Every structure is written in structure tokens, then in C-alpha cells.
Amino acid sequence: PDSYDAPDPRIKQLARRSTVTPGGAACRYNDIIPADHCLHDVQDMSTLNHPRADLSKGQYGCVGQGLHIAKKLLPYIPNNAGILLVPCCRGGSAFTQGAEGTFSESTGASQDSARWGVGKPLYQDLISRTKAALQKNPKNVLLAVCWMQGEFDMSAATHAQQPALFTAMLTQFRADLSVFNAQCHGGSAADVPWICGDTTYYWKNTYATQYDTVYGGYKNRESEGVYFVPFMTDGNGVNTATNAPAEDPDIPASGYYGAASRTNGNQVSSNRPTHFSSWARRSIIPDRLATAILNAAGRTSAFISGKAPEIKPSPGGNTPSGPSADTSVRTISLLPAAGEAAAQGWSIKDGGIQLSDGVFKITKQSNKTWS
């Protein structure tokens, strides 16, 4: 956290665990909290500490790519905007095998949830947390979904079902999110790109035919808003580093300790080449995912200008809003269902009322009551 994995105050995440960091400040499910290298995913990776980690410096758990994707996107968004990550990952999950687990509105999917599909606990977790993120603030916009899944479908006899099950879930996700179309990239949930990442060379070498079916199912679907991102090799054709000790060695002279010094008690899997290294998750993986997001969603005036989406409420309705850090000052925005506020006779009466861009705002001042 004090070097490669340093957080940024403009990058937040939706909470899942009971504390922001192990032993840290308390938080509740779906609170907005700082994002770091080990996000609040379905599977809690915060206890798999590297044997050389200094926990007093926050060097806990495993390194994921989420924070690093966001950090690479920051230079491309307006300075007054931030990024809210919605962690919903579950390692070893599949569409065609695995335990379904359970889902709760107050805690999300259980850690043993390992089955994707329409209506499954993992899907309920994904859609409910996405909606929660958008409800936090009407200016929040769903930019993209990063999707890295397929390994455990390849090892199933029913692997050929994965592409159709994925497509069905994608279709349902977009339908369920259509109520938030105004807060989605392009003005529609159907326009939000799904950025589908590749896997390690181990999986392709072991399951060549299955790889072509599962990961091939993500390819050539740009017209559907599905974008495949290759990770298997770098720009020179060299295999992207995994957790194999030779590919992520310790470099004591530099103070870097990789997967080589992890053991069965603190590593993701004893089958080392099945997972990308933490170094890859800081570099080539977020580089390519961020680039894919920018190519799919970044070349729009709304993205470049940071213009908030227009929310069209029904008469008498409220626009969604998130909790305010300062409860002594609250703002309610009322938008006319049709026409302009000024044309309807609204005017400024005192300093607590503002009329800006056709939006009439009344701000509650500290130690004052509504009247």
C-alpha cells in the first residue's frame, strides 16, 4: 500500500466485510469505503497473507486487479469525478458446476456460492450491488463490467453450455437494470460494455478444446457490447506471469517478494500456474482491461466532460440519493416533469435556495428545521 498498491482517495468500493481492512474501521454491507489492493469480493481473500508481509503497513491478503484498473482510468476522467468499484468476484465459480450457495439482501452472496446463472445467488449479488451503487447518487454512472470467468466450466463435462448460460445472464442483467438506463453508459443498460478477460496458459494447454468453446464464446461479439481481452502472452509472445515460483520470484535486494515464497497455507492454489501473479495483476492485466474500457466507453462526450446523466422523475417522485457524510446539511433536488423551472414561476427567495440549470434546490442549513 505504500508503493505499487497505494490507494487513491478518488477510488472507492462498495463494502462487504464488517471492517474496511482486517482489524480496521467498522463498515456495513454496501457502504462506500476506500478501495485498496484486496477488494471486498464474495470470496474473502484478506486472510491469505504473504509470509513476508508487514501487516502493520496494510500488506494483507492478495493483490487483485480492481484497484489498478481504476488507477489507470483516473487520468482520463474529470478531476472532480471518482471511481466506485463494485466487487462481486468469486474464484472457482462456474455456470455448469459448483455449489449455488445462498443470498441475503443484508450480506450478499455467501462465500460458498460458486454457481453463476440467472437467479443464482451470485447473480443476485451482482445485480443488487450494481443497483445499490447507482442509488447512492443520481450522478453515478455504470461505465463497464469487468468479467473474468470460465476456468471451472472448462473442467466440467457440460462445458459447452457455458456460452449460452452466460448470454442468458447478460440479457437478464441488462433487463433488470433497465430501470437505471439513465445512469448507464450510453443511456441504456444494453450499451454498458462487458469486458471479458482471458485466462492463463495452463488452462488453454490443459483444456484446448474446451478453451475454444468457453473463451471463444466471448470473442467477436463487439456488436453485442461484449469485448474479449487476451492476457495469455505479453507483447513479445511470452506467457504472462503466473504464481509459478519461477515466474514470480523473490528479489530480496529490491525488497520484492513474489509468489515464490508463499506456501500451501497462504496461497490461492497449490496448482500455481492456474492463477496470474500479483505482478501481472498490477501491470499487464489492468493495462489491457483499462484500455478496453476506454475503447468501448471512453470516447463519448459524457465520459470526457463528466456530465451527469439527466434523471427524469415522474411527477411528485424523488430522485435516488446516497447518504451524506454531513447529516446537518442535506440537499433535495426537484426536477419538473416537463418544461423549465423558471418558466413555471420558480424564483430565488433567499440564500438557501438555488436555481441552476433548471434545477430548483433547497438546502437544509445546520440547526434549522424544515418549514
Per-segment meaning from a language model:
Residues 1-316:
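Cell-envelope and extracellular/periplasmic
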Residues 319-371:
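Extracellular glycan-recognition regions
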